[in-house]
């Protein structure tokens, strides 16, 4: 499971600066979907081979009224659910009463905590950081988040215990993906193997949209139980099931449930739990409340799923019992606000009565098969060539961009790597054309598809020209002829 790093500290110590530095490598992925805003408190980060969720818990005053009364409930939950806490302080301002209050709270929680003295640029860092040792939380790590100084070392040290589980043996900051170039036979065999694996399905949504009701409807009424076993506060519940011969693992993010009445179930919402479930899933089922329409929180959760590259199915719940005018308004809003994810199937359901629930699995299987489908290099290259035949790449400085071949670069989401000359100069409009062409040709449904372009290596670059023997003889004769003419 992907680790969670919480940034904790009083206001203006640099938490947002560090958050932006850690998460900015993922901005481009969300930016590929116009109309989607990135959540400013939760994000995915990838640094020095480590992939993790980073949470900015907001500023904590730590006044005499007591720290817990001044911390937002979600900030407290973030600290509780985090695997690692980076307690950020201001080396320039020195140790404050708020820092002492925060440290006292963190010691009481027995969390894995690292004290970070930020803003050490331009000062005597060792002297400025000395007093932070009195917090009693161990070593003090120096950082200048605005310049990136000390950030990588800090993350590597904090996440070292997770290195083996994450398979940190890679170089640089590129994700390790399946880039095998399949033949037609190998692709077919691998696809058959994948179809025998359980589909991990994360059911996500903001509070009270009906996640618990839908989970219980899918599993059957006999499975309505209260999940209050140790550990469920922090981790999602993994429930295996089988449907029509296909195995699934339902990742239930509804949270700890308690029964206040016989049939009443109250759920505890956790953003962090949702993010971890999305990371671990093959397919994400996003539930939207028909009575409330598309809320900002829905778009935030959608952004997490797209950022992770997961296959996606959308279910608009509580569709029964609302009049036709509201239904028309909701559909119009979906077209307007979710038009940028035209690859995802949208279902209108009633989890309470079961209307439309059965059809969800057709789209879930379709999305999984599209996201994990293995495609041979020859087929991808043929599709690339057909796209060029239908619409030639543009001219760049009088020369046509030349695309040579394509191969798979990863799955879930599908990634197509295209090699060629001057591909870095391809306009975004042509890249979008090619992405849509590949999606149509491969019949990809329910998952985003990514294209990556790589320049062909020039074998003569940075090499001096070496003449053949005959060219060398001709050169000598020419030089001799020129020399004879000058002497005459």
From Swiss-Prot:
Residues 373-457 form the KH-like domain. GO terms for molecular function: GTP binding; ribosome binding. Gene3D superfamilies: 3.30.300.20, P-loop containing nucleotide triphosphate hydrolases. Residues 473-488 have a biased composition (Basic residues). InterPro entries: G_ENGA, GTP-bd, GTPase_Der, KH_dom-like, KH_dom-like_a/b, P-loop_NTPase, Small_GTP-bd. GO terms for biological process: ribosome biogenesis. Keywords: GTP-binding, Nucleotide-binding, Repeat, Ribosome biogenesis. SUPFAM superfamilies: P-loop containing nucleoside triphosphate hydrolases. Pfam families: KH_dom-like (PF14714), MMR_HSR1 (PF01926). GTP 1 binds at residues 9-16, 56-60, 118-121. CDD domains: EngA1, EngA2. Residues 3-166, 199-372 form the EngA-type G domain. Residues 469-488 are annotated as: Disordered. GTP 2 binds at residues 205-212, 252-256, 317-320. Belongs to the TRAFAC class TrmE-Era-EngA-EngB-Septin-like GTPase superfamily. EngA (Der) GTPase family. GTPase that plays an essential role in the late steps of ribosome biogenesis. Associates with the 50S ribosomal subunit. HAMAP family: GTPase_Der. This is GTPase Der. It comes from Shewanella putrefaciens (strain CN-32 / ATCC BAA-453).
């Amino acid at each position: 499971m992907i680790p969670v790093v919480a940034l904790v500290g009083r206001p203006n110590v640099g938490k947002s600066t560090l958050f932006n530095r850690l998460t900015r490598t993922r901005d481009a992925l969300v930016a590929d979907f116009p109309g989607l805003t990135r959540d400013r408190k939760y994000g995915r980060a990838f640094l020095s081979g480590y992939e993790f969720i980073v949470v900015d818990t907001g500023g904590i005053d730590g006044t005499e009224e007591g720290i817990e009364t001044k911390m937002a409930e979600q900030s407290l939950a973030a600290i509780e659910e985090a695997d690692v806490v980076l307690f950020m302080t201001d080396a320039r301002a020195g140790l404050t009463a708020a820092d002492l209050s925060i440290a006292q709270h963190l010691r009481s929680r027995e969390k894995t905590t690292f004290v970070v003295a930020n803003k050490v640029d331009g000062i005597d860092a060792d002297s400025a950081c000395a007093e932070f040792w009195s917090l009693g939380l161990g070593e003090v790590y120096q950082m200048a988040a605005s310049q990136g100084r000390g950030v990588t070392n800090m993350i590597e040290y904090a996440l070292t215990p997770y290195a083996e589980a994450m398979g940190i043996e890679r170089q640089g900051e590129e994700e390790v993906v399946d880039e095998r170039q399949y033949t037609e036979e190998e692709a077919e065999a691998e696809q058959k193997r994948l179809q025998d694996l359980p589909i991990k399905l994360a059911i996500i949504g903001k509070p009270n949209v009906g996640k618990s009701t839908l989970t219980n409807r899918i599993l059957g009424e006999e499975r309505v139980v209260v999940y209050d076993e140790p550990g469920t506060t922090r981790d999602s519940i993994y429930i295996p099931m089988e449907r029509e011969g296909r195995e699934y693992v339902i990742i239930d993010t509804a949270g700890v449930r308690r029964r206040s009445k016989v049939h009443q179930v109250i759920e505890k919402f956790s953003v962090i739990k949702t993010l971890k479930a999305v990371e671990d899933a093959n397919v994400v089922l996003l539930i939207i409340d028909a009575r409330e329409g598309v809320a900002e929180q829905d778009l935030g959760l959608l952004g997490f799923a797209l950022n992770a590259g997961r296959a996606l199915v959308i279910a608009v719940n509580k569709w029964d019992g609302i009049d036709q005018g509201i239904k028309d308004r909701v559909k119009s809003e979906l077209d307007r606000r979710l038009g940028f994810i035209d690859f995802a199937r949208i279902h209108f359901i009633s989890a309470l009565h079961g209307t439309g629930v059965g059809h969800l699995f057709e789209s879930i299987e379709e999305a999984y098969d599209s996201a994990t489908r293995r495609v041979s290099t020859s087929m991808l290259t043929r599709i690339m060539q057909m796209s060029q035949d239908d619409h030639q790449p543009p001219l760049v400085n009088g020369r046509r961009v030349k695309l040579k071949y394509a191969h798979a670069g990863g799955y879930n989401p599908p990634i197509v790597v295209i090699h060629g000359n001057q591909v870095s100069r391809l306009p975004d409009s042509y890249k979008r054309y090619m992405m849509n062409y590949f999606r149509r040709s491969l019949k990809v449904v329910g998952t985003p598809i990514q294209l990556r372009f790589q320049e062909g290596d020039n074998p003569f670059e940075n090499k001096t020209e070496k003449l053949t023997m005959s060219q060398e003889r001709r050169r000598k004769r020419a030089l001799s002829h020129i020399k004879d003419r000058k002497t005459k």
